[in-house]
Amino acid sequence: MPHTSALLGFALVSLGLVLTPGPNMIYLISRSITQGGAAGIVSLGGVALGFVFYMLCAAFGITALLLAIPFAYDALRFAGAGYLLWLAWQAVKPGGRSPFQVRKLAVDSPRKLFVMGFITNLLNPKIAMLYLALLPQFIDPTAGSVLTQSVVLGAIQIAISVSVNAMIALAAGSIALFLANRPSWMLVQRWLMGTVLAGLAVRMAVEAKRV
C-alpha cells in the first residue's frame, strides 16, 4: 500500500487536474446543458470506464518500466512536470476558453451517451500521459508491490474525478448561466487553475527521488 503522504499528495494532484478544463469536462458539460444532468451522468459512466482501462494499462506498464529501467523515475518525473506546465499554459494562454463556453450537441440515446463518453476519454492522450507521468511520482518500491500501489492510486484518481465531474454535470446549466453574464469569473477560474498547476509542476521537478 502507498504511504499516507503519497495517498494525500496524489489525491490533491488528482483534484487539481479534474478541476482543470479538458476534453472530458467540456464534453460532459456540453451534454448536460443540452440534454440535462441525467444525460451528463450517463456520459460520465463511459468516461469512468475509460479511466479504468487506462489505469490497468498504465499500472502494468509502470510496474515493468520501474523495475527494468534505473533512470525511469527521473524521466517520468520531468515528463510529469512538463505535462502540468502544458496544462497551466492551456488554462491561461490568450484566447483560452472556459469549459462552460460550450457548443450545443445533438440529443442521443443513453447507450450512445455512454459509448461517446468512453470514446472521448479513450481518445484523450492527456489521460494516458496522466497515468504514465504522474502516477510514478507517488509510488515507493520499498512500500510493497508497485502494481498494487498503482491500482490503489489509480482508484483514488477515478473516485475523485467521477465525484467532481458528477457534481459539475448536475450543476452545469446553473453554472453556465451564472458565468455567461460574468466573464471576469471565467478569467479568474482559468488563472487560478493555471497557477495551481504551475506550482505543482515546479514542486514535482525539484522533488528528489524517494528512498
Question: At which residue positions do the language-model features occur?
Answer:
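Flexible cytoplasmic inter-helical loops of multi-pass small-molecule transporters
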Residues: K93-P110
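Selective transmembrane alpha-helices of multi-pass membrane proteins
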Residues: L67-R97, V164-I168, A172, A176-V211
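Juxtamembrane transmembrane-helix termini in multi-pass membrane transport proteins
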Residues: P2-Y73, A133-I158, A169-A172, A176
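A short amphipathic helical element positioned immediately N-terminal to and/or at the very start
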Residues: F114-L122
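Juxtamembrane helix-boundary/capping and inter-helix hinge elements in multi-pass membrane proteins
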Residues: S32-A39, D108-S109, N181-S184
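Primarily residues marking transmembrane-helix entry/exit sites
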Residues: H3, L7, S109-F114, I127, ...
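Hydrophobic alpha-helical transmembrane segments in multi-pass integral membrane proteins
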Residues: M55-A59, L123-M129, L197-R210
